Amino acid sequence: MAKLTVEIVTPEKRILSVQADEAIVPGGRGLFGVRPGHTPFLSLMEPGALTLIESGRRESYFVAGGFVEVGNDKVLVLADAAEPVTGIDVEGARRRMAEAQERMKGMSSEDARFELEQATVRREAARIGAANTARA
């Protein structure tokens, strides 16, 4: 049976290069699955869990947005950041999210820092969601 080659690359380093039966990707319009022989395409990724399935075993990674290129039995994930969901400190993520929300209370939505804090809230919420989904 054909396999996918899946690579996850961030600006800092190559996180992963493995063979998989299927990849489930957090696309710009929702989750989508990729199996060998899939039609080539390019898509935006939203922050969320990228799940790889190999022989019935699932392994998930948090990806902080970016792009995914599918083609020739290969999935190339170009992520802003990525980490195994098993390494996510959920309590730490909740704390960072709450701190950012607290800082936002004293800001106008036109304040340049407001968008940065809002991005922190979205990212930490996505990390928590990815960790909880993978552990369920």
Swiss-Prot record:
Keyword annotations of the record: ATP synthesis, Cell inner membrane, Cell membrane, CF(1), Hydrogen ion transport, Ion transport, Membrane, Transport
Q: Which domain of life, per UniProt?
A: Bacteria
- Main localization is membrane
Gene Ontology MF terms? ATP binding; proton-transporting ATP synthase activity, rotational mechanism
Q: Name one Pfam family in it.
A: ATP-synt_DE_N
Q: Where in the cell is it found?
A: Cell inner membrane
Write down the CDD domains for this protein, in alphabetical order.
F1-ATPase_delta
Q: What's an example GO cellular component term for this entry?
A: plasma membrane
Gene3D superfamilies from the xrefs?
A: F0F1 ATP synthase delta/epsilon subunit, N-terminal
Matching SUPFAM superfamilies:
Epsilon subunit of F1F0-ATP synthase N-terminal domain
The annotated topology with respect to the bilayer is: Peripheral membrane protein
Functionally, this protein is described as follows:
Produces ATP from ADP in the presence of a proton gradient across the membrane.
Assembly and binders: F-type ATPases have 2 components, CF(1) - the catalytic core - and CF(0) - the membrane proton channel. CF(1) has five subunits: alpha(3), beta(3), gamma(1), delta(1), epsilon(1). CF(0) has three main subunits: a, b and c.
Please report which protein family the annotation says this sequence is part of. Answer: Belongs to the ATPase epsilon chain family.
List the PANTHER family: ATP SYNTHASE DELTA/EPSILON CHAIN, ATP SYNTHASE EPSILON CHAIN, CHLOROPLASTIC
Name of the molecule in the record: ATP synthase epsilon chain
Taxonomy of the source species: Bacteria, Pseudomonadati, Myxococcota, Myxococcia, Myxococcales
